[in-house]
Amino acid sequence: MKDYTNEINAAVRTLGDIAFKEASRTCPVRTGRLKRSITLRTQHDRAKNADSCVIGTTVPYAPNVEFGGRGRHPKPFLENGLEAARKSTVLIFSLFMKGDQ
């Protein structure tokens, strides 16, 4: 049986990139600080031989923008990125598993 670890890790990294790009694209911009603070970090767990992606921001007001607060309506941008990756998951994994990436 073939080991698909490399293909799975590549698909995870691609989905992380999709989520990052969509979060950046849909991030509300007033000064641009929030949008510039969005980062994508890929991590590799050697014990599991598995990649993971973390997308986020360290701007203190990011949760108030994402979820709303104090009379402000939510303006999700990280959730938009997650949703874009979720919608692409089956397609991306099928392409990488077939070798069509």
Regions found by a protein language model. Give the residues of each.
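Short, Lys/Arg-rich flexible segments
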Residues: 1-101
